[in-house]
Amino acid sequence: VELEEAYIQTTPDFNFPDGLSLKAGKAFWTLGYLNEHHVHADDFANRPLPYRVYLNKGWNDEGAEITYTLPTDYYAEIGGGFFRGDDYPIKGGDGDSPGAYSVFARIGGDIDQNQNYRLGAYYVGGDNAGGRKGNDDDNTFKGDSTLYVTDFRYSYAPTGNVREQELTLQGEFFARNEDGTYDDVVFNGTSYGWYMQSVYKFNSRWRGGLRYSQMETPGVP
């Protein structure tokens, strides 16, 4: 049995400025669209390929994150955090100091009564001081690792009620740069991954969708 989440989070009536929130503990942190959601809530049976390669399905580290919702007419949020670095995408922090850090920004809002959107950009960086093994091989990477993510989601509800009918278009793009060594062989390279999916909800009980994901990786020693 593994504990996935155990955290504390400030509420709007906490003695913080309006729009400011703090979250600390172990959680699925802000990174792209899917990471904050549990897998049982996903539209498909498994996570897209970049999530499985870069995040081992999800970034679930220990740390603290602060977010600020800007006082605008549309949804706008910025934030960042410090983390132990014991989970993917870093996986290999020494545990004595923050081994990973993040910053992010996202915007969104209603286009009209039936349509809405959200866009986001995210950065996670850290040092694999303890070494990180790949999900499907025994190569160990030590060095600096940075992950960049952008995401978007568009929703259209023909009736104005997303519980009845909804068409969604969603995608995320990943780029990971590694500068260090693989089993003492010097390596500096960037890999890429992305996915695109569309799901149509016919009614409250039935929906269907399509998804495509792809990876582009450099040669690894």
Where are these regions (language model features)?
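Outer membrane beta-barrel
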Residues: 1-88, 95-102, 106-113, 197-213, ...
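Active-site rim elements
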Residues: 91-93, 137-138
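Detector for outer-membrane/organellar transmembrane beta-barrel domains
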Residues: 114-220
